[in-house]
């Protein structure tokens, strides 16, 4: 595998401070939008908000900056001073430390600060405790307001800070340059801006964290320098401690949170530091091995139990240290994407009032709730993978043999309360007597304390987490019982509730109640095996290789070495371009809408009779056949492309950016992205630990400091080797930019000086840019060199990929979606006796069972039946896609892929397919769904919730999440969505003798099944991704170019559909009513579409629901619903006095020599406008086409 050479790009950035304190009067307009986008707990005056141009920062805000981080002595005598600058970018979040109470809280949940403090103590993490001396020198928000002439009761103060120096602010290593304050305009209002600089400016050649910032007599302070007052604001420091440092401490398993802050700040100031940054006295979580697993102490063989546990703990801290260093490198990166500008958000188009704009933002955030829920409830989510386990050496006889997979991340949420041990494995003081929960088989309930830990014990982030969870459902759509919140709250007044956070009047919004409502979806940690990581990321390129055959015949494979062709010429002959031409032609015919692949175009006005159906199907077939023939001719004749080998090497692929401004404008979504990145960094570092340990005396006290640089270099060497794409930048100061900084002698209230000289300390910078995720198109067997375990795994997969040898129901075949939607136009007489409503399920079931009376069929009907059966059987013979088309777009793309597979002689196994589960939003489908937002609690809860639903337009946040699936991913990915998916990173060496470690980011699964997302299906041939589109909402729209199997209502209903039969609709309705009971009436058309993936049946379900309510005089009655269903079933079961029946199975078998489509006898263009001839064409040719040999021009 060859990688692209690294290229250095010179980029110019302006010099500037490490941050600003913005001070403004509370805006009269836009405050509701800011509150919706922010994270704030109701019991706190602080908040975290997104960095948004036009909302929190001014237009023209420069995101990339060369930060003034210190000073250096220069000149012969060392008497002159120059400034030291480091590139960085501004954090995508801003931190409100005064006036946060003017923002509506993200949730009504009470006492979240108390919950976070209790959780922090329970899991052993340190609390924020300022030093007594610091409190004497606090710079309060009120004092700043007084200095700037603002009313403290109406002011809003927040910190905008560069990514690498947030921790420096939290440990008081910065000061406010009051003399450099200026004014900017945000949203038409004047805003004060005070620059923030590091104290290291006054300590030349001091590139470390200042342990005692308030010591004005520090020996490193330059001669005659006027040392400023360090910036210490207690609410801000606590906010940064909780929302910035806390999540990193949880991810890196470091109970001493302050030590993480100091380590990160030190890495920002000292660009040359490569040793250990985390403290030497770090502790580790003790946990028992899972049942049936060799105890960790014995895994290294030879009875060296202590050594085995020691290496596991050493790998844990060294991988965490390497991840922190890697995050520090990324924090110094310079990105191309500018911060999002609220005035350019497409979702505001046509929204003329403030209320309409707030509603649009509320609806969009509810979309993201589905992704947040998946990250919380998936057991392999990066949020839960907080511990390191040891699988033992790859070769028990040779402990030095390196293994990339010896150390790996495992879920640690449920064992976080276990005792803490030191590096030797001894329990540390304060944790004696604590019970030790096992990794697998524990009985811990997922509680509010666990949720607080996922948020780093930040009340603000926890409040925003609850904002999203309140918009998730408890998997009603898959048939689970959801708690009745009204009854629970009413009953709790007479019973003991195990919660000391709420009262009877606030219980409906309490975190405990929200988790109780979602109890069926709670993560269940039933495995500690090495597996995929559930990650949250963002697609920031509209290009992806997510077509049915992925990157088959891609530009890079067709490009000639001599470079004699233009890129446009090459691109026209790729598989991707061929699919674009097919879709464009079908869009011209008005069959599809490329921007919405699930849409049916204008087919409702086109298919008005059976002849129109013939025309549509034939046109689709001919368009595809023509493009495939031309594509294969160009590949073979023009380029000598090894088309069969190319199929074996084809992958579905996409890239997830590490650019922080590409994420959604929400602090919690940014947290999910950060935690995902930290998990990926640790996974890479853990793969190199065994190689670093091999042959070394790991017990030595100095081992970490000595070998941490080795591990760091190994991780850095993994860049650009297949998975983690990196970019090398040469950073220079902007042309003509003057370096302005505070005077070192005149004091912090003096104006800035622009006579400084300075240079960039990190001139050439290499940093990760994106993660490459891919999935092989073909099912690949184990290689000859694979291990026995790998061969066994592949053998277990073969049955899942094996194409079954059975005839598929016509309605579940390629034309099923057309036959169901347009049955009345195609077969107007295809209705049960005594019914006036044409019914496709009854018609095709009776037809295929040879039970349909022949007198009901005209000659035109028989010709159409022959045409449909011929197409369905021929398609089935060459089909290797384990999905039936749901629309014309899918029909065309699947047919095209199958034709290419036929040319390549593919056989036996289904290919891998992709499905996007697209997050959407809607108003609350029931009063219960709005319970958490009710202004009234206690006895008035139901009335309050009903009043909210009745006036729902007045509540911009009153939206809930929903999902829809789509099997054509390229248009979905072109919307540059936020995504959640499983990611498994393979590592391997290159060619023999090459010590470069290559990686592959494999598209894997989220564990937890329906807990993670109600529409996830256990199917090894399909890869799923949850997607929340950004283009068209918060950025410009782009132009088109294994968990355990769980039975659910979703699968039960699809099983009924796959079995077929005349009474499918009634059977589906009965199964739903028996499962959901009265909740069936709450299902809307979107829910039925998500459950059934069938538009016709979804409309039938809505009609049956309406009839059931009508039968019950407007009230839901299960008996009435079942009665309606049985009447519908009886109607379609009637065949009357059939007399002679039409023999569907034998009809047309007199011609055994018909040619399947795609062969030499395929109809020409003239066929599109005429009916198919009844005699002479075999509509029942069921045999697969003969295998082709080498492709020849005659075949083409």
Swiss-Prot record:
Q: Where are the transmembrane segments?
A: none
Where is the region Required for nuclear localization?
1170-1196
Keyword Zinc-finger recorded: yes
Feature: compositional bias, Basic and acidic residues:
1174-1196
Keyword Transmembrane assigned to the entry: answer is no
Major location (coarse): host cell
Query: InterPro entries, alphabetically?
Result: DBP_sf (IPR035989), Viral_ssDBP_head (IPR043031), Viral_ssDNA-bd (IPR000635)
Q: State the Gene Ontology BP annotations.
A: DNA replication
Tell where it localizes.
Answer: Host nucleus
Give the unnamed zinc finger regions.
499-512
Chain positions of motif Required for filament formation? 843-844, 1142-1144
A Gene Ontology cellular-component term: host cell nucleus
- GO MF annotations, alphabetized: single-stranded DNA binding; zinc ion binding
Kindly state which keywords UniProt assigns to this record, in alphabetical order: DNA replication, DNA-binding, Host nucleus, Metal-binding, Zinc, Zinc-finger
Family the entry assigns: Belongs to the herpesviridae major DNA-binding protein family.
Q: What do we know about how this protein assembles, alone or with others? A: Homooligomers. Forms double-helical filaments necessary for the formation of replication compartments within the host nucleus. Interacts with the origin-binding protein. Interacts with the helicase primase complex; this interaction stimulates primer synthesis activity of the helicase-primase complex. Interacts with the DNA polymerase. Interacts with the alkaline exonuclease; this interaction increases its nuclease processivity.
The name under which this protein is listed is: Major DNA-binding protein
Source species: Human herpesvirus 1 (strain F)
Q: What is the lineage of its organism?
A: Viruses, Duplodnaviria, Heunggongvirae, Peploviricota, Herviviricetes
The gene name reads DBP
């Amino acid at each position: 595998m060859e990688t692209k050479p690294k290229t250095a790009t010179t980029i110019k950035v302006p010099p500037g401070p490490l941050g600003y304190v913005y001070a403004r009067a509370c805006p009269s307009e836009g405050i509701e939008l800011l509150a919706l986008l922010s994270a704030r707990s109701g019991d706190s005056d602080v908040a975290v908000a997104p960095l948004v141009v036009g909302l929190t920062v001014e237009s023209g805000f420069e995101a990339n900056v060369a930060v003034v981080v210190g000073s250096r002595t220069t000149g012969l005598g060392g008497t002159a001073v120059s400034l030291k600058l480091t590139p960085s970018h501004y954090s995508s979040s801003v931190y409100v430390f005064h006036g946060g109470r003017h923002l509506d809280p993200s949730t009504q949940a009470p006492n979240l600060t108390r919950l976070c403090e209790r959780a922090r103590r329970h899991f052993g993490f340190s609390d924020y405790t300022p030093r007594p001396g610091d409190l004497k020198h606090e710079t309060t928000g009120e004092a700043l307001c007084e200095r700037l002439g603002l009313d403290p009761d109406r002011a809003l103060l927040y910190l905008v800070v560069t990514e690498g120096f947030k921790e420096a602010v939290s440990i008081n290593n910065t000061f406010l340059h009051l003399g450099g304050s200026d004014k900017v305009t945000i949203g038409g209002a004047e805003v004060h801006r005070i620059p923030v600089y590091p104290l290291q400016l006054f300590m030349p050649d001091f590139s470390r964290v200042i342990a005692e910032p308030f010591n004005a007599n520090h020996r490193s302070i330059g001669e005659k320098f006027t040392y400023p007052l360090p910036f210490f604001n207690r609410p801000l420091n606590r906010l940064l401690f909780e929302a910035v440092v806390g999540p990193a401490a949880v991810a890196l398993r470091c109970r001493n949170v302050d030590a993480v802050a100091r380590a990160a700040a030190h890495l920002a100031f000292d660009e040359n530091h490569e040793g250990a940054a985390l403290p030497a006295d770090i502790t580790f979580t003790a946990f028992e091995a899972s049942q049936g697993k060799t105890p960790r102490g014995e895994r290294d063989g030879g009875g060296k139990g202590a050594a085995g546990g020691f290496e596991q703990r050493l790998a844990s801290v060294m991988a965490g240290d390497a991840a922190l260093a890697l995050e520090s490198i990324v924090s110094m990166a310079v990105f191309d994407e500018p911060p999002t500008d609220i005035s350019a958000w497409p979702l505001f188009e046509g929204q003329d009032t403030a209320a309409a704009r707030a509603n649009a933002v509320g609806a969009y955030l509810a979309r993201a709730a589905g992704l947040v829920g998946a990250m919380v409830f998936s057991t392999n989510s990066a949020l839960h993978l907080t511990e390191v386990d040891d699988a033992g050496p790859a070769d028990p006889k040779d402990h030095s043999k390196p293994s990339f997979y010896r150390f790996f991340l495992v879920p640690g949420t449920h064992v976080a309360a276990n005792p803490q041990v030191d590096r030797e494995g001894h329990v540390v003081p304060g944790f004696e007597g604590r019970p030790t929960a096992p990794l697998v088989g524990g009985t811990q309930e997922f509680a509010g304390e666990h949720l607080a830990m996922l948020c780093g014990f930040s009340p603000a982030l926890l409040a925003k987490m609850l904002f999203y969870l309140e918009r998730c459902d408890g998997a009603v759509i898959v048939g689970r019982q959801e708690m009745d919140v009204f009854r629970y709250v009413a009953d709790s007044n007479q019973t003991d509730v195990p919660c000391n956070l709420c009262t009877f009047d606030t219980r409906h919004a309490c975190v405990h109640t929200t988790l109780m409502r979602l109890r069926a979806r709670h993560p269940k940690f039933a495995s500690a095996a090495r597996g995929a990581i559930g990650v949250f990321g963002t697609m920031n390129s509209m290009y992806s290789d997510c077509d049915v055959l992925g990157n088959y015949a891609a530009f890079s494979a067709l490009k000639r070495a001599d470079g004699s062709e233009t890129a446009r010429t090459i691109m026209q002959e790729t598989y991707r371009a061929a699919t674009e031409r097919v879709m464009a032609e079908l869009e011209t015919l008005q069959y599809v809408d490329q921007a919405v692949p699930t849409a049916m175009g204008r087919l409702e006005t086109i298919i008005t009779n059976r002849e129109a159906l013939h025309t549509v199907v034939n046109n689709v077939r001919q368009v595809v056949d023509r493009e495939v023939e031309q594509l294969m001719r160009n590949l073979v004749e023009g380029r000598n492309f090894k088309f069969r080998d190319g199929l074996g090497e084809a992958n579905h692929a996409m890239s997830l950016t590490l650019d922080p401004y590409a994420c959604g404008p929400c602090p919690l979504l940014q947290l999910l992205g950060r935690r995902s990145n930290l998990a990926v960094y640790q996974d890479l570092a853990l793969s190199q630990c065994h190689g670093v340990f091999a042959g070394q005396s790991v017990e030595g006290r100095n081992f970490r400091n000595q070998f941490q640089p080795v591990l760091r270099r190994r991780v850095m060497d993994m860049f650009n080797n297949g998975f983690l794409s990196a970019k090398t930048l040469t950073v220079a100061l902007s042309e003509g930019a003057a370096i302005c900084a505070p005077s070192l002698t005149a004091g912090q209230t003096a104006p800035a000086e622009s006579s400084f000289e300075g240079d960039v300390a990190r001139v050439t910078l290499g940093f990760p840019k994106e993660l490459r995720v891919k999935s092989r198109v073909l099912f690949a067997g184990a290689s000859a060199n694979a291990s026995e375990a790998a061969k066994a795994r592949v053998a277990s997969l073969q049955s899942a990929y094996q194409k079954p040898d059975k005839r598929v129901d016509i309605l579940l075949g390629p034309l099923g979606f057309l036959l169901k939607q347009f049955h009345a136009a195609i077969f107007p007489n295809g209705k049960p006796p005594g019914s006036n409503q044409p019914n496709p399920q009854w018609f095709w079931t009776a037809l295929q069972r040879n039970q349909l009376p022949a007198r009901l069929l005209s000659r035109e009907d028989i010709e159409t039946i022959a045409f449909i059966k011929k197409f369905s059987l021929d398609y089935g013979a060459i089909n290797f896609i384990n999905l039936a088309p749901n629309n014309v777009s899918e029909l065309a793309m699947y047919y095209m892929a199958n034709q290419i597979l036929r040319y390549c002689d593919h056989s036996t196994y289904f290919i891998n397919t992709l499905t996007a589960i697209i997050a959407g939003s809607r108003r609350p489908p029931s009063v219960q769904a709005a319970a958490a937002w009710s202004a009234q609690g206690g006895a008035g809860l139901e009335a309050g919730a009903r009043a909210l639903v009745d006036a729902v337009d007045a509540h911009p946040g009153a939206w809930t999440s929903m999902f829809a699936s789509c099997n054509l991913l390229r248009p979905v990915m072109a919307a540059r969505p936020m995504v959640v998916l499983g990611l498994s990173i393979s590592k391997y060496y290159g060619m023999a003798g090459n010590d470069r470690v290559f990686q592959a980011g494999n598209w894997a699964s989220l564990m937890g099944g329906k807990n993670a997302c109600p529409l996830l299906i256990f199917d090894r041939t399909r890869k799923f991704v949850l997607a929340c589109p950004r283009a068209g909402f918060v950025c410009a729209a782009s132009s088109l170019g294994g968990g355990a199997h769980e039975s659910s209502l979703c699968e039960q209903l699809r099983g009924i559909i796959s079995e077929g039969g005349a009474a499918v609709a009634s059977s589906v309705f009965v199964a739903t009513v028996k499962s959901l009971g009265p909740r069936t009436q709450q299902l809307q058309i979107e829910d039925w579409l998500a459950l059934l993936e069938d538009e016709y049946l979804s409309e039938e379900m809505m009609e049956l629901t309406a009839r059931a309510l009508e039968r019950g005089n407007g009230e839901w009655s299960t008996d009435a619903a079942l009665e309606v269903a049985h009447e519908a079933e009886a109607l379609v079961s009637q065949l009357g006095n059939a007399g002679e029946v039409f023999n569907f199975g034998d009809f047309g078998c007199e011609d055994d020599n018909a040619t399947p489509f795609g062969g030499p006898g395929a109809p020409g263009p003239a066929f599109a406008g005429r009916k198919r001839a009844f005699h002479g064409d075999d509509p029942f040719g069921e045999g697969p086409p003969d295998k082709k040999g080498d492709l020849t021009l005659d075949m083409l």
